[in-house]
Swiss-Prot record:
Promotes colloidosmotic lysis by binding to the midgut epithelial cells of insects. Belongs to the delta endotoxin family. Keywords: Sporulation, Toxin, Virulence. One of its GO terms (molecular function) is signaling receptor binding. It comes from Bacillus thuringiensis. This is Pesticidal crystal protein Cry1Ha.
Length: 1172
């Protein structure tokens, strides 16, 4: 058997036709030079993880480990590293220019560092202040000039490792300017400008590196050994450093910060150097997953060509902080049994930090040899948490292929078991295609590693800001997923696949130091919309947390996509181990959680910084001339609370300055709000303007949620009498072809209906669950000394900054405290004064709402499709309005004729003698056929035909009043039950046939009577409408005390009866009913109901921009609860009306109702004074 080493020729990756046959030519790739780059990069990463502290010492150290020791030869190594990995030669002039610039940056930085040392020794020396300012400016300018050269077009990828070094230097320099600037003599504006540059360049540099790293991976076209080398080496030399760039934000990270790198990288397949692999690597990469730690490795041994080798393995792991978890992975390779299985159990305090492998490449046979690539053995070196060495695990034999050549220690000055940089976390397996075996036989393990900064216990420091990626959760919730990180986050990130709110996964942390400890909680996230979630400190309490939008729906994740959101109130950790969970909607991406320790000085500075950011974020520019469109009035109030809670002791001047800016923002907000009485000074208090509402609405002062007045809308027991609040936006305030937005804040609500009405009704029903008081039970100072809400006390921040925006073609997300609805305005007409109606309504018993900070403001001009859509809607609305006008003229004419026929003259002060109640009902019905007298959404708001309806309805009321004046019997229609009637025995008043009240006399001994005052000598007509059931007679008698008695009798009409000439028979009444048709329907029936006079032209003009985009709420209103209107239906068959003339001789008469047998049902009793 012949052992062959380094027999094959180096072939560039982009020339390979079959990546499985790739050759590992380590010598031609200058492995030692690449190892040196890795050592320098790992040392820098360690330095950034441990020592990225404010102060001059950081700059001194950065110079000592990088810029003071690296010369042209070392910079050339950086350039050669990626150049060799991707087989792309950097042109000579680009290389020379890059090295020259890097040397110049080193020289300039050295001069700056020297001036910084001198100034630090004498910080009040103005000459030294001037000198350090000059040196800073020189180095800053040199970096501004050099960095574009280090991203030369066409060479962005091979220049990455030197680009990131220059970027890191620039960020460090700018952080110095922000930290020392005022002590150097720089003014506040200049310092703030440098800070803004710092934040902008963190994003710019991060995105550049991540973009070109990912493009470099894509260029390989698939996973190969060279792909793994590039992923590993460029992650170490570029992305690990980029992941720590955000820590240069000194205002966000003013103290030492503990970061973790959770990314996973791969060492080369364990194969003899120089031997072609002939193994498939496409399935080597692991899918994104929660970070795990190796707990058990079982290796199976096979034999091929007489060589015992690693044939397959099984792995078990656990998640972070959960010793009891056991993740078992499927078998990799085969469970061969040429020797007994090697079982390796790793204690939770142990780490495999190094492997020494024994690969072999064997060629046997003659003309057609068999080539075998296998691993004969591996020594696994173990480190313990207490920095002690541990006995290694040995699988069969130790080799010379050292993982340290690819993953060197981060600290060469200490023993390897202390200074190591990575821990083994997993192993996968590559094998030759079956079709090539046995002539080409390969069984090769591939190890994956994580950085040692990612601790297995999620320790939270009492004195440092602790960053913990959420992929270090110990469980993954259903519907949540881990996705590949964008490259600049130091690992993978998490999100949810389900559109509904759901959990992300449970994170367990270990609190170090003395207990209890208090921390501010921050989350680094990205979001495609203004969203909200819930942060749970298990088992309780829960905190609402906002995720304001940071990116568009179709945008890629960039560094600028990520932001920090903070719980308003610090939390206190009282146990050595704590657990947290996070509930988020789809479209929110979570990178990490941050624990910021709280102390008095730091807390004051932190609060000031947060307030400054919040205030500056209100405006469109630094001069505070314009307010951002998406800044709500409620948000301004919350920012005002932040400012008011600043410490007078630590930052009184800054507090006053910020307070003035917030007041200016509030004035700008008021100025753009088109609503009147935006602070709810009164309801129904301003004539023809301001808010109108039902009497049960209350205005309440500020509380722990609202800084200003808000309104409470209670439920109602009858949907025909809803609770309502409305206001009209006058046409004069609106601009043509413009979109407007109604928005506000809902503390809680149930069945709250919100309308915007112009050409159509924009309608939403919003249910927002409340949580009661914001103050935890443990907080005793939630009330101020004068009874006011203490908004500075710790509270549960359940009010998320979520936009419930209902736009064209989008679904509105309910159950959010913030809401907004849009409406588009077409052409404006001051004469027509259509305006926009804003309506809030509740029509259920369980309904309720507390709302405030309402705004109606201009959003944007309409263009393109939106403009065409509103023009179309406007035209449809006007066409239907014309149809309505035509039909209204017809209906009005008929109704007016019916009304006029009731009276003797045009003064409408006297009814005709033959006018009866059926005629008035018939006329009233015709009046109520007038459409659009009131808005169907809320019938207290006048519609387009309100004037003519009110005109005729007023005359109908007059007719009722005159008729009531003629009828001297009180409550003769029994609408008020038995009021004014004397009762003997058992009788009932029942409501029949849709609101008709009738008197039911079921027993012969029962009697109903009423004493009536009359004018002696005048004539009266007694008119009774009634129905007799069963045998016997029903009688209505009129009489004086002793004499002058008359009566009307009712029976089943089985036989033809002869009545006096002054009575009306059954047939006569039926004829009257047909003539007057004393029934009518609701005055606000839907548009689809046609008028009887012209049923072929319905007036349904509830136009919408898109028929499916708006709720067509303008169809029907079945409630007739105002203007005294009742829906009288015709009498059922069998009822008859009878009359008699009566001339009393005294001032009192008695009306008595009774029966002889069966049941007597009386609809109405009238005693009418005859005309003289």
């Amino acid at each position: 058997m012949e052992i062959i080493n380094n027999q094959n020729q180096y072939v560039p990756y982009n020339c390979l036709s079959n990546p499985e046959n790739e050759i590992l030519d380590i010598e031609s790739l200058s492995s030692r030079s690449r190892e040196q780059v890795a050592e320098i990069s790992l040392g820098l990463t360690r330095f950034l993880l441990e020592s990225l502290l404010p102060g001059a010492s950081f700059g001194f150290a950065l110079f000592d480990i990088i810029w003071g020791v690296i010369g042209p030869d070392q910079w050339n190594l950086f350039l050669a590293q990626i150049e060799q990995l991707i087989d792309q030669r950097i042109e000579a002039h680009v290389r020379n220019q890059a090295i020259s610039r890097l040397e110049g940056l080193g020289d300039s930085y050295e001069v700056y560092i020297e001036s910084l040392r001198e100034w630090e020794a004498s910080p009040n020396n103005e000459a030294l202040q001037q000198d350090v300012r000059n040196r800073f400016s020189n180095t800053d300018n040199a970096l501004i000039t050099a960095i574009p050269i280090l991203r030369e077009q066409g060479f962005e990828i091979p220049l990455l490792s030197v680009y990131v070094q220059a970027a890191n230097l620039h960020l460090s320099l700018l952080r110095d300017a922000v930290y020392f600037g005022q002590r150097w003599g720089l003014d506040t504006v200049t310092v703030n400008n440098h800070y803004n540059r710092l934040i902008n360049l963190i994003n710019t540099y991060s995105d550049h590196c991540a973009q070109w790293f990912n493009r470099g991976l894509d260029n390989f076209g698939g996973v190969s050994a060279r792909y793994l080398d590039f992923q590993r080496e460029v992650t170490i030399s570029v992305l690990d450093i980029v992941a720590l760039f955000p820590n240069y934000d000194i205002r966000t990270y003013p103290i030492s910060t503990q970061s973790q790198l959770t990314r996973e990288i791969y060492t080369s397949p364990v194969a003899e150097p120089g031997a072609s692999l002939n193994a498939n690597l496409q399935n080597i990469l692991r899918e994104p997953h929660l970070m795990d730690f190796l707990t058990r490795l079982v290796i199976y041994t096979g034999v091929q060509s007489g060589i015992y080798h690693w044939a397959g393995h099984e792995i078990s792991s656990r998640t972070t902080g959960n010793l009891s978890s056991n993740i078992q992975f499927p078998l990799y390779g085969t469970a061969a049994s040429a020797d007994r299985a090697f079982n390796m159990n790793i204690h939770h305090s142990e780490t495999i930090y190094r492997t020494l492998s024994a690969p072999i490449y064997s060629v046997s046979g003659g003309i057609s040899p068999n080539r075998t690539r296998v691993v004969e053995g591996v020594r696994f070196l173990i480190a313990r948490d207490n920095n002690l060495d541990s006995l290694p695990f040995l699988y069969r034999k130790e080799g010379t292929l050292d993982s340290f050549t690819e993953l060197p220690p981060e600290d060469e000055s200490t023993p390897p078991y202390i200074g190591y940089s990575h821990r083994l976390c997993h192993a996968r397996f590559a094998r030759s295609p079956v079709i090539l075996e046995p002539s080409n036989f390969a069984r090769l393990p591939v190890f994956s590693w994580t950085h040692r900064s990612a601790s297995p216990t999620n320790e939270v420091s009492p004195s440092r800001i602790t960053q913990i990626p959420w992929v270090k959760a110990h469980t993954l919730a259903s519907g949540a997923s881990v996705i590949k990180g964008p490259g600049f986050t130091g690992g993978d990130i998490m999100t949810r696949n389900n559109i509904n709110l759901g959990d992300l996964g449970t994170l367990r942390v270990t609190v170090t130091g003395r207990l209890p400890q208090s921390y501010y909680i921050r989350l680094r996230y990205a979001s495609v919309a203004n969203s909200s979630g819930v942060f749970r400190h298990l088992p309780q309490p829960s905190y609402g947390i906002s995720f304001p939008r940071t990116m568009g729906t179709d945008e890629p994740l960039t560094s600028r996509s990520f932001a920090l959101t903070t719980l308003f109130t610090p939390i206190t950790l009282t146990r050595a181990q704590e657990e947290f969970n996070l509930t988020i909607p789809r479209g929110v991406y979570i990178d990490r959680i941050e624990f910021v320790p709280v102390d008095a000085t730091f807390e004051a500075g932190y609060d000031l910084e947060r307030a400054q950011k919040a205030v500056n974020a209100l405006f469109t520019s630094t001069n505070q001339r314009g307010l951002k469109t998406d800044i709500t009035d409620y948000h301004i109030d919350q920012v005002s609370n932040l400012v008011e809670c600043l410490s007078d002791e630590f930052c009184l001047d800054e507090k006053r300055e910020l307070s003035e800016k917030v007041k200016h923002a509030k004035r700008l907000s008021d100025g753009r709000n088109l609503l009147q009485d935006r602070n709810f000074i009164s309801i129904n208090g301003l004539l023809d303007r301001g808010w109108r509402g039902s009497t049960d609405i209350t205005i309440q002062g500020s509380d722990d949620v609202f800084k200003e007045n808000y309104v409470t809308l209670p439920g109602t027991f009858d949907e025909c009498y809803p609770t309502y609040l409305y206001q009209k936006i006058d046409e004069s305030k609106l601009k043509a072809y413009t979109r407007y937005q109604l928005r506000g804040y809902i503390e809680d609500s149930q069945d709250l209906e919100i309308y915007l009405i112009r050409y159509n009704a924009k309608h939403e029903i919003v249910n927002v669950p409340g949580t009661g008081s914001l103050w935890p039970l443990s907080v005793e100072n939630s009330i101020g000394p004068c009874g006011e809400s203490n908004r500075c006390a710790p509270h549960l921040e359940w009010n998320p900054n979520l936009d419930c925006s209902c736009r064209d073609g989008e679904k509105c997300a309910h159950h959010s405290h913030h809401f907004s609805l849009d409406i588009d305005v077409g052409c404006t007409d001051l004469n027509e004064d259509l305006g926009v109606w804003v309506i809030f309504k509740i029509k259920t018993q369980d309904g309720h709402a507390r709302i405030g900070n309402l705004e109606f403001l201009e959003e944007k001009p309409l263009v393109g499709e939106a403009l065409a859509r509103v023009k179309r809607a406007e035209k449809k609305w006007r066409d239907k309005r014309k149809k309505l006008e035509f039909e209204t003229n017809i209906v009005y004419k008929e109704a007016k004729e019916s009304v006029d026929a009731l009276f003797v003259n045009s003064q409408y002060d006297k009814l005709k003698a033959d006018t009866n109640i059926a005629m008035i009902h018939a006329a009233d019905k015709r009046v109520h056929r007038i459409r659009e007298a009131y808005l169907p959404e809320l019938s207290v708001i006048p519609g387009v035909n309100a004037d003519i309806f009110e005109e005729l309805e007023g005359r109908i009321f007059t007719a009722y009043s005159l008729y009531d004046a003629r009828n001297v019997i009180k409550n003769g229609d029994f609408n008020n039950g038995l009021l004014c009637w004397n009762v003997k025995g058992h009788v009932d008043v029942e409501e029949q046939n849709n609101h008709r009240s009738v008197l039911v006399v079921p027993e012969w001994e029962a009697e109903v009577s009423q004493e009536v005052r009359v004018c002696p000598g005048r004539g009266y007509i007694l008119r009774v409408t009634a129905y007799k059931e069963g045998y016997g007679e029903g009688c209505v008698t009129i009489h004086e005390i002793e004499d002058n008695t008359d009566e009307l009798k009712f029976s089943n009409c089985v036989e033809e009866e002869v009545y006096p000439s002054n009575t009306v028979t059954c047939n006569d009444y039926t004829a009257n009913q047909e003539e007057y048709e004393g029934t009518y329907t609701s005055r606000n029936q839907g548009y689809d109901e046609a008028y009887e006079s012209n049923s072929s032209v319905p007036a349904n003009y509830a136009s919408v921009y898109e028929e499916k985009a708006y709720t067509d709420g303008r169809r029907e209103n079945s409630c007739e609860f105002n203007r005294g209107y009742r829906d009288y239906t015709p009498l059922p068959a069998g009822y008859v009306t009878k009359e008699l003339e009566y001339f009393p001789g005294t001032a009192k008469v008695w009306i008595e109702i009774g029966e002889t047998e069966g049941t007597f049902i009386v609809d109405s009793v009238e005693l009418l004074l005859m005309e003289e």
